[in-house]
Amino acid sequence: MRTPTLSLLTIAMAGSLATATPALAAQWNLASPYGDASFHTQNTKQFAEDVTEATDGELTITVHSGGSLISHAEIKPSVRRGTVQAGEIFLSTLSNESPIYEVDTLPGLAGSYADAYDLWQASKPIITELFAKEGLMPLYAVPWPAQGIYTDFELTDAAQLEGLRVRAPNINTQRFVENLGGIPTQTEEADIPTAFSTGRVDAMITSVSTGKSMSAWDYVSNYSDANLWLPKNIIFVNKRAFDRLDDATQKAVLDAAAKAEQRGWQLSKEDSAQSAETLESRGVTVSEPNTELKQQLQAAGQQLFEDWQSRAGDQAKQLVERYRERQAQQGQ
C-alpha cells in the first residue's frame, strides 16, 4: 500500500496561508446595571468605542447596559469567573466583603468633587489590592453627584424621618438611615418608581442624577441637597483576560480607561448641575438643609465614621492618613 504524501506545493501553500491569517480579534462583554440614559453608561460606551478605535478593532467591547445580561449582584462574581470579561458596579455594594469599600459612603468625609477625588486616590491602592486577590483589576472609577434626601415634605428636622421607609442602596447608607430613626429599604434603581407607588418606600437617599432619571417629581416634592457623600461606580476587568492581550492592546485599554475616568468626573459635575435644574423645573423644591438638620446629619455620620474605623482597623487608618495628607498638600 502506498502511503499518501503531501506535495511540496501543498505544504508551501498551507504555510503561506497560516502566516497570512491574522490573529483573531478579541471580544469582551462588559455588564452594567445602569440604563442608557445614565451618564455612567454613556461614558462606559465611549470607553468601549475608544478601545475599538485605538486597537483598530483588535479588541471590541460590547456594553450590556441596564442589567440586560447579568443582574447587579452577579456582575462581580461573573467577571471573577470569566463568564464576562468586564463589569461596572456601584462600589459600596461590596461593603459586606470589606469595610474599605464603604469609604466613599461615609457622611461628611468627602462631600465635594475635590475631596472625593482625593479620597479615590488615597483608597485606590488598597482597593486595587483587594480586587487583585480575586483575579480582578480596576480600570477606572467615576462618582455620582453628591447624595441628598428626597421626601414628599419639607425636611427641616431629622425627627421627621423617624419610622419612614427610606431607600438606602448599600449597607452604610442603611446604617445612616437607622441612625436617623428611619427604616432602611434596599431597592434597585429601576424599581424606585414602583417602590414609591406601592408604599414600599417613603423617602430616598440618592443623587440628583438618579432623581432625574427616575422622574422623582412623580412621587416626591422636596430634595434636601445635603452633600452627604459622592459614591462611585467602578469599572473592572478579569485579570486573566487582560493578560491575554498583547502589550499594545493593554496600553490602549489603560489609556482609554484614564480618559474615561477624567471624562466621567467632568460628566458627573455637569450632570449634577443639569439634574438639579431639571428637578426644579419639574416642581421639586431643591434646598440646602438648615443649620439644625446639618448638625443632626453630621452627628449621625460621625457615628458611622467611628464605627467604620474600628471595623476597618489599620487599613482605615492608613487610608484616612493618605487622604488627609493629599488635602493638606492641596490646601483643602
Regions found by a protein language model. Name each.
Residues M1-L9:
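Bacterial N-terminal signal peptides that target proteins for export
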Residues T10-L17:
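Hydrophobic helical h-region of N-terminal Sec-dependent signal peptides
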Residues T19-A25:
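Sec/Tat signal peptide C-region and signal peptidase I cleavage site
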Residues A26-Y117, S123-Q332:
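N-terminal secretory/targeting leader peptides
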